[in-house]
């Protein structure tokens, strides 16, 4: 399951991902499973135990939502965990501790000195074998991590395997919208790094008619393509090497790419900072944290042309009020198109879905808000 939920001071601030898995969990229990072992990650602890990333609060919340006991286990592998899951009382529900406390889950970690390392193949296999011994049937309902080649996704060797209800719902919606969409298909891309989204961008360039590139990744595009001075804005060294290839593919596929021409900038990454809007070069000491009014207008026109819209990644740092306007404009234009013209609108990616939820009841107008993070990167 994907229980990667926001936790502040030990309290879950948004339980949507937990609630989204309840139909699958209830179906397993109602259909005679002797026990249910749930596993998930939370945050990015880099292969080390970190109490701030413990799933214990999730177990407590899940117990309340299910109305039945949920046993929280202090680890996810090893003899003690295997013993606890081997012959439990009928109807038992277990939640394992965060899979990412072990570097073998992601195949990489960071030691206490801050140095990156990789566990051996033997260590990874031992970890996978222990997870495999915890059950008889493997059900994947973690749409938010389904795109990752992690041990819990790709390394559990059980012959009986199935997709959960949430996974099925997400896959059905994305395939219906992207394999045979009403056109034009507009993709709005945000996010910090080009290199993190290269596979997504390449996949979508095969299907879409227009693409808006905003968010932190836009600065890498602008610096590479236009030699723009970007001040203290985010720059992705790895992503810079693939920018031209993306532009070339877009031209080859006749996809119109929209990049920002103006930016709302701050001298600090915090509310109350000095805010300036720059069209063109950004001076040293300032960083771009939202799109300016010029791209907002171009984006509004693209949305008015579209019949299907996929939005993945906010264009600005919406958590800071001064840099929220671009995200709100995107959202309201998409809501209007969905409501007034029956456009199919899909909001995907953890940050984008979180932003949509902050807009209250208006978010109900969106055709589909995905529970996935990077996995809703089709």
Curated annotation (Swiss-Prot):
User: Which parts of the sequence bind (2R)-3-phosphoglycerate?
Assistant: 1-4, 16-17, 40-41, 43-44, 99-100, 147-148
Keyword entries, A-Z? ATP-binding, Glycolysis, Kinase, Magnesium, Metal-binding, Nucleotide-binding, Transferase
Q: Which residues form the signal peptide?
A: none
Q: Which residues cross the membrane?
A: none
Residues bound to CDP are: 191, 196, 215, 313, 318
Q: Which pathway does the UniProt entry assign to this protein?
A: Carbohydrate degradation; glycolysis; pyruvate from D-glyceraldehyde 3-phosphate: step 2/5
Top-level division of the source organism's lineage: Eukaryota
Binding residues for Mg(2+): 192, 196, 351
| Xref: Gene3D superfamilies | Phosphoglycerate kinase, N-terminal domain
Question: Where do the annotations place AMP binding?
Answer: 192-193, 197, 216, 288, 319
**One CC-aspect GO term:** cytosol
* A Pfam cross-reference name: PGK
**Which InterPro entries does the entry link to?**
Phosphoglycerate_kinase (IPR001576), Phosphoglycerate_kinase_N (IPR015824), Phosphoglycerate_kinase_sf (IPR036043)
Q: Which residues bind ADP?
A: 191, 215, 318
Q: E.C. number, please?
A: 2.7.2.3
Write down what this protein is called.
Phosphoglycerate kinase
């Amino acid at each position: 399951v994907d229980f990667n939920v926001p936790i502040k001071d030990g309290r879950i601030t948004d339980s949507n991902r937990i609630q989204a898995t309840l139909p699958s969990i209830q179906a397993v229990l109602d259909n005679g499973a002797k026990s249910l072992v749930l596993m998930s990650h939370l945050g990015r602890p880099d292969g080390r135990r970190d109490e701030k990333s413990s799933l214990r609060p999730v177990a407590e919340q899940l117990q309340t939502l299910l109305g039945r006991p949920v046993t929280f286990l202090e680890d996810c592998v090893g003899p003690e965990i295997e013993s606890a899951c081997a012959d439990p009382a009928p109807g038992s529900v277990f939640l394992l501790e965060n899979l990412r406390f072990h570097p073998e889950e992601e195949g990489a970690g960071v030691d206490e000195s801050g140095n990156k390392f990789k566990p051996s193949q033997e260590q990874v296999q031992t970890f996978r074998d222990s997870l495999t011994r915890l059950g008889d049937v493997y059900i994947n309902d973690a749409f938010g991590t389904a795109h990752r080649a992690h041990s819990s996704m790709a390394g559990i060797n059980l012959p009986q395997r199935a997709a959960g209800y949430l996974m099925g719902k997400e896959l059905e919606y994305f395939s219906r919208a992207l394999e045979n969409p009403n056109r034009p298909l507009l993709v709005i891309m945000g996010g910090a790094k080009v290199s993190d989204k290269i596979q997504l961008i390449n996949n979508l360039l095969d299907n879409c008619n227009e693409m808006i590139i905003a968010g932190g990744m836009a600065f890498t595009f602008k610096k590479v393509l236009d030699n723009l001075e970007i001040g203290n804005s985010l720059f992705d060294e790895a992503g810079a090497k693939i920018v031209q290839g993306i532009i070339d593919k877009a031209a080859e596929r006749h996809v119109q790419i929209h990049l920002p021409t103006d930016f709302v900038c701050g001298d600090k990454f915090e509310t109350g900072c000095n805010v300036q809007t720059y069209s063109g070069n950004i001076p040293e000491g300032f960083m771009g944290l939202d799109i300016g009014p010029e791209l907002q207008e171009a984006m509004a026109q693209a949305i008015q042309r579209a019949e299907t819209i996929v939005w993945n990644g906010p264009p600005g740092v919406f958590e800071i009020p001064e840099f929220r306007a671009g995200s709100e404009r995107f959202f309201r234009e998409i809501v209007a198109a969905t409501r007034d013209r029956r456009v199919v609108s899909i909001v995907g990616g953890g940050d984008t879905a979180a932003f949509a939820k902050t807009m209250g009841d208006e978010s109900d107008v969106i055709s589909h808000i995905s529970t996935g993070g990077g996995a809703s990167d089709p």
